[in-house]
Amino acid sequence: MEHDFSTSKIVEFMIRTKNLTFGYRSRRKVLNDITLELGEGHIHGLLGCNGIGKTTLLKLICGIMRPSSGEVRVDGIDPMTRQPQMFSELMIIPEEFDLPNLSLERYAAMMKPFYPRFDHGSMRRYAEELKVNTEDKLHNMSMGQRKKAYIAFALACNVRTLLMDEPTNGLDIPSKSIFRRLLASYVDEERMVVISTHQVADVESLLDNIVILDNEGVALAATTTEICNKLKFGRAEENDSVLYKETTIAGEMAVMENRAGEDTQLNIELLFNAVTADRKAINNLFNR
């Protein structure tokens, strides 16, 4: 039965899309028939090949772009209606962005009226941990420093939905570690984070829900627990049901059906390659 957004009661804060499609007149569809539910209390990983539409999906969720067809709702609200109560609970950190020629302190003073739960003390603490001087002009910072400054501000806004597009690009190794720690402590049962990334290793330990997009739409959407219940990762034994395998520096690694319910360490990169190689086989297993 199809889901009717206009009449259903939303019982928890959630991003929902239904048959969401976006394309330019002169180009193929960038997104095709995306139906998703992303709930609070999770860090969602949004994965896909270059040009598959991950950034576009984030922009549609924010109302920066208008869908060609289909629907998107954030806590039951259409982003295109520009309702203040939705935008006060939603923030995006783009991969690339321009900030005014102000210090982080002055930028925060200018923007905090839009975010009722903004906490100035938290921003200063995050900035200090990320080694950002809140009095330095943003224009004078390197790309990595600007990104860390914006991350500090975004976390201090305490929004319920935080969207991040390649958040670790430009961060050095110590900053990535600090970023992971701050983000892990940010999410609670009333907040969600959606991370679009190619740098899976930077955030793999944070993700508890995985969404993989391909040219046909949503290739896979599952929690990490569901994935590890269905699949196992590692070296294949003689009787294993192998769905995908590849040669790595560590030897031949495989994605296999987890028939015996064994404990397994999720390998998101291997999972992504398996879904890309044979979407149908993975889908058939998850749909049983």
Per-range role (PLM):
Residues 47-49:
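The feature captures the beta-strand-to-loop junction immediately N-terminal to the Walker
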